[in-house]
Amino acid sequence: MAKGIKHKSTTILDRLNALWALLTISDSDFNAYMGSYDELFSASPENTKEDYENGVPLKGYSQGSSSELQELYKVMHLLCTLGSVEKMYMPPEIDSEQSVLQNQILFEQIVAKDLKLNAGEKVLELGCGCGAIAEHIASLTGAIPYGMNLDESQIEKSWKNPNLSIPNFTVGDFNKPLEFDDNFFDAIYAIQPLTYVSDHAFTFKEVFRVLKPGGMFVINDVAALDTYDSKNEHQKTLIQHTRELTVFGGFWYYKYWEDSFIEAGFTLISSKGRPAVEMIKKEVSLFDKYEALFRFLSKIHLIPKKTNALMSRMNENSQSYIQAEEEELLTLNWHCVGQKPERL
């Protein structure tokens, strides 16, 4: 893929297609989505700062390969496409005056620099969604994009993008052996999918295996911060509400992410968290309007009750997300950069 291709935002047609899919959703897909919350987000694993300091081992997310997760994302992607987060992640605040999409673009420019790619080199995105981030990273670097994602519907959407090579984007699971040769990729990255890792040591070792010596591994994901106390019921409730709104799995103190890099053999280059409060407020405001509109249209029988129920469930307790970040309990954007040593 050549450099310089203009970054594309979510189009009106994208949103109309997503809306139509939500309006015509089958009973089976509706019931699977609504039931997935109890299956996926009850008693999800946590490791806090206190756990880390007491040497408590990291506990992975056991349902990271489950059919329930696939059913959740089949619908969640459609809901997110109505807003600014078709890429399925909330960006950190790079410029609080800019839109959510513009901050995604600015953050992806940072990631592209971290990856240190040259034109023609191969880069893999774990949890690539429909390939929108991969397309942008490739346009910035001239690298050849690859992607894998658990949700087949999003991979099928990536195949319709003329800027992405169909064979390079596959249904895949980072909780299983990666189907690539040793030392295959020049760089690998993951933006907010890794809370579904079942075994950090396994997944990070697999990334290490398929990465070339000197290659960069960049992640940006959810992390518990110093302030979070799992014994504080108020804080615990805010985190649970945020988990259900943003559909993250495991919740781990940021030092566990750092150790996962080091224990797999990477040199940890940098590790930092960024807030996203202003971005969150923008998106919550938008989805509050959607929720009010859907409720009204459902009441006068212009849209199915199922469609209204989907929006209401997704947007439930959205203010808790804002509060959790303002109280510095978590960030959805803990950003680590690691490098595989040139010589092993």
Cite the ranges covered by each PLM segment.
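Conserved alpha-helix/loop element of class I SAM-dependent methyltransferases that forms part
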Residues: L101-A119
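N-terminal auxiliary segments of SAM/dcSAM-dependent transferases
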Residues: G4-L82
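A short glycine-rich, Lys/Arg-flanked "PGG" loop and its adjoining helix->strand segment in the class I
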Residues: A201-M216
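Short alpha-helix
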Residues: G249-G265
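A short acidic, Gly/Pro-enriched loop at the edge of an enzyme's catalytic core
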Residues: N175-I188
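Short, glycine-/aromatic-enriched active-site segment of Class I SAM-dependent methyltransferases
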Residues: A223-G249
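Class I SAM-dependent methyltransferase SAM/SAH-binding core
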Residues: I133-K176
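C-terminal helical/coil "lid" or tail adjacent to the Rossmann-like core of SAM-dependent
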Residues: Y73, P275-E325
